[in-house]
C-alpha cells in the first residue's frame, strides 16, 4: 500500500462513515471503474485505488491502524520521533498499547491471514396478518458479496494461482522499526504487499480485480414459522456474504414486518375482535356467527348481555411460537341501539316500557326511549 493516500477521499466517504457506508461506496466505485466496463485511461488505476482503500477501511483492525497514523505508513504518526509536535503523548492515541502489544504480547493476536467469516446481512420481509399466524413458504432474492465465479474466490487470473508473499514469506505480517519516545522499537504490522493474506497475486482476476468477491443476486427458500410477530427475526446460517481467506459465509437475518388487520388486534398468541349485537339480541339472547382467522364459529350470547362483555373462543388465536398449542380469540360485544323506529316498533317498546314500569316521561327528549322513538 502506498503512503499518504487518503482512503476516505478515494471512496468518497467521511472519516466517521459506518461499515455499511464504506461497503456501499466500494461496491459502487468498483463497478464504475472496473476495467472491463470503464475504458477510460485512468480507470484501471482508480479501480486499484478503490480496492486498496477498501482493503484497509473494510477491515476494522487495519482501519484503526490507518486512523491512528493518518496514512498507510505507520511511521507517519510519530512526526519524526521525540516528544515534539503539538500534542506530546496525546499524538499517539492508542499507539503505546499497539507498540507494547506487538513487542511483548503480539503472539496472542489473531493472525491477519486467518480465515474470517463473511459479513451478516439483514432482509426485511413484509407479512400479511394471516401469513404471520399460519406461516408461509416463499423464495426471496437479494444482492450479496459472493465468491467470484471466475476465480473461485482466489482473486487470481484464470489458469494462475496466488503464490506465497515474497515480502512476509506467507506470515501476513512484517517487522517495522519505529522511532518512539522510548527509543527505537520493532513492531509487527500487516504486510503491505499481501494485505495480511500471506498470498501474493501476480495476475489479478479481471472479474473481481483480485478481491475474490463480486456482487451477485442470490435466491434462498424461506419457511416462515407459524405464529411469528412483528419485529421478530429468523437467522439463516451461511446465507450472508462470502468470507475471507477461505472463511465461511456470514448469516442472513430476516426481520418480519407484520401488516395490521382491519378486523383483529393481536397480542402474542391472543387475538381480539369487536362484535356488535342488537339490543334485542342482548336482551333476549341469541346464537351468532363470529369471524376468526380459522373461519366462522358460533357463539351463544346469553340473555341480558351488556355492552363490554367479553367472550373467549378457545384455540381460535395464533400458534404459540415457543411452546405448545394455540392462543384464544377474545370477543368483546357492543350493544347497538337503532337510531330510527317505525310506528310498530315504537308501540312495542312503549308496551315493554309500561310492563317494566319505565313509562317514557314525555317531557322533552332526554329520556331513553325519546332518543330513538322521535
Swiss-Prot record:
PROSITE patterns for the chain: DNAJ_1, DNAJ_2, ZF_CR
First and last residues of each zinc finger (CR-type): 135-217
GO molecular function list: ATP binding; heat shock protein binding; unfolded protein binding; zinc ion binding
Keyword S-adenosyl-L-methionine among UniProt keywords: no
GO CC annotation terms, alphabetical: cytoplasm
GO process terms (BP): chaperone cofactor-dependent protein refolding; DNA replication; protein refolding; response to heat
CC cofactor note: Binds 2 Zn(2+) ions per monomer.
Cofactor: Zn(2+)
Residues holding Zn(2+) 2: 165, 168, 191, 194
Residue spans of the CXXCXGXG motif repeats: 148-155, 165-172, 191-198, 205-212
SUPFAM superfamilies according to UniProt: Chaperone J-domain, DnaJ/Hsp40 cysteine-rich domain, HSP40/DnaJ peptide-binding domain
CDD domains found in the cross-reference section: DnaJ, DnaJ_C, DnaJ_zf
InterPro entries membership: DnaJ, DnaJ_C, DnaJ_domain, DnaJ_domain_CS, HSP40/DnaJ_pept-bd, HSP_DnaJ_Cys-rich_dom, HSP_DnaJ_Cys-rich_dom_sf, J_dom_sf
Chain positions recorded as Zn(2+) 1 binding sites: 148, 151, 205, 208
Highest rank taxon of the organism: Bacteria
Residue ranges, annotated region (Disordered): 308-328, 347-374
Compartments it resides in: Cytoplasm
J domain boundaries: 6-70
Function statement: Participates actively in the response to hyperosmotic and heat shock by preventing the aggregation of stress-denatured proteins and by disaggregating proteins, also in an autonomous, DnaK-independent fashion. Unfolded proteins bind initially to DnaJ; upon interaction with the DnaJ-bound protein, DnaK hydrolyzes its bound ATP, resulting in the formation of a stable complex. GrpE releases ADP from DnaK; ATP binding to DnaK triggers the release of the substrate protein, thus completing the reaction cycle.
Subunit structure: Homodimer.
PANTHER family (UniProt xref): CHAPERONE PROTEIN DNAJ (PTHR43096:SF48), DNAJ HOMOLOG 1, MITOCHONDRIAL-RELATED (PTHR43096)
Protein name, entry field: Chaperone protein DnaJ
Organism per entry: Pediococcus pentosaceus (strain ATCC 25745 / CCUG 21536 / LMG 10740 / 183-1w)
Source species taxonomy: Bacteria, Bacillati, Bacillota, Bacilli, Lactobacillales
Amino acid at each position: 500500500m502506498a503512503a499518504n493516500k487518503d482512503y476516505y477521499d478515494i471512496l468518497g466517504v467521511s472519516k466517521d462513515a459506518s461499515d455499511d457506508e464504506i461497503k456501499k461506496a466500494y461496491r459502487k466505485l468498483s463497478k464504475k471503474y472496473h476495467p472491463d466496463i470503464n475504458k477510460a485511461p485512468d480507470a484501471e488505476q482508480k479501480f486499484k485505488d478503490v480496492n486498496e482503500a477498501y482493503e484497509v477501511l473494510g477491515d476494522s483492525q487495519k482501519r484503526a491502524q490507518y486512523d491512528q497514523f493518518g496514512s498507510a505508513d505507520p511511521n507517519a504518526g510519530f512526526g519524526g520521533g521525540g516528544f515534539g509536535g503539538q500534542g506530546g503523548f496525546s499524538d499517539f492515541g492508542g499507539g503505546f498499547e499497539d507498540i507494547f502489544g506487538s513487542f511483548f504480547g503480539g503472539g496472542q493476536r489473531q493472525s491477519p491471514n486467518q480465515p474470517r467469516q463473511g459479513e451478516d446481512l439483514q432482509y426485511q420481509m413484509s407479512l400479511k396478518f394471516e401469513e404471520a399466524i399460519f406461516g408461509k413458504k416463499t423464495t426471496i432474492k437479494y444482492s450479496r458479496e459472493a465468491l467470484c465465479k471466475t476465480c473461485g474466490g482466489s482473486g487470481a487470473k484464470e489458469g494462475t494461482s496466488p503464490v506465497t508473499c515474497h515480502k512476509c514469506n506467507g506470515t501476513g505480517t512484517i517487522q517495522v522499526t519505529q522511532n518512539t519516545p522510548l527509543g527505537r522499537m520493532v513492531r509487527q504490522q500487516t504486510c503491505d504487499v499481501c494485505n495480511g493474506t500471506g498470498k501474493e497475486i501476480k495476475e489479478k482476476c479481471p472479474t473481481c480485480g483480485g478481491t475474490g468477491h463480486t456482487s451477485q443476486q442470490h435466491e434462498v427458500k424461506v419457511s416462515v414459522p407459524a405464529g411469528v410477530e412483528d419485529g421478530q427475526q429468523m437467522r439463516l446460517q451461511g446465507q450472508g456474504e462470502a468470507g475471507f481467506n477461505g472463511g465461511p459465509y456470514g448469516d442472513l437475518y430476516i426481520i418480519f414486518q407484520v401488516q395490521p388487520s382491519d378486523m383483529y388486534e393481536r397480542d402474542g398468541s391472543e387475538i381480539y375482535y369487536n362484535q356488535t349485537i342488537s339490543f334485542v339480541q342482548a336482551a333476549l339472547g341469541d346464537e351468532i356467527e363470529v369471524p376468526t382467522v380459522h373461519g366462522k364459529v358460533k357463539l351463544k350470547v346469553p340473555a341480558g348481555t351488556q355492552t363490554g362483555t367479553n367472550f373467549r373462543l378457545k384455540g381460535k388465536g395464533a400458534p404459540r411460537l415457543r411452546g405448545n398449542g394455540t392462543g384464544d380469540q377474545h370477543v368483546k360485544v357492543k350493544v347497538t341501539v337503532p337510531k330510527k323506529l317505525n310506528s310498530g316498533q315504537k308501540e312495542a317498546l312503549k308496551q315493554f316500557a309500561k310492563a317494566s314500569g319505565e313509562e317514557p316521561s314525555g317531557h322533552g327528549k332526554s329520556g331513553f326511549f325519546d332518543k330513538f322513538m322521535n
